[in-house]
Amino acid sequence: MVVSCGISPRYSDIDAGAMAAAAIDEAVRNAVCVGVDVNKIAGLDNFCWPDPIQSEKTPDGKFKLAQLVRANRELERICRAYRLPCVSGKDSMKNDYGKGADKISIPPTLLFSLFGDHPDVRNTATSDFKNPGDRIYLVGESMDELGASEVSFMLKERGEAKGIGGNVPSLDNPEKLFKSYHSLSSAINSGLVLSLIHI
């Protein structure tokens, strides 16, 4: 049995839909990195949200509700692409404290947990190198997507950037990613991959 999770609350500062997609994808990548059978996975969605109801206390409630709708649309899109059923979940929708200018709200957040079958735990990849001279491969594509990343926040803190970046990672073709994950998991279980880490 493999258990993993994914969470990316900072992405909500730019796009709550991308935040949800990234959380699901991270949970899947974590599981794939140890060799989960991607045909035997299921997920749990846990929404932790600021008050999404328009009111005097929550003047931006419509925007927070729109973020929730966007996150749910991405939840459906990515889970369908990964053939990943959500078997349970939990929603906490009033994660705010205080009033007026002193009000503190959590960022719109989806914690996505995943569990799945591992055919043979003796064929599990770990993140450490095994031998001097091991080859390193980057699987997938790299894009201009550093928005809300650790690098963006570091540059802002150092005064080298005004905002938190531009584009957050987007999953434009999750079906293609899922094929890569399937191949990678098969390679791990065949003993071809000994070390693996998701980034």
Q: Which residues does each predicted region cover?
A:
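Glycine/proline-enriched, intrinsically flexible loops and inter-domain linkers
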Residues: M1-I197
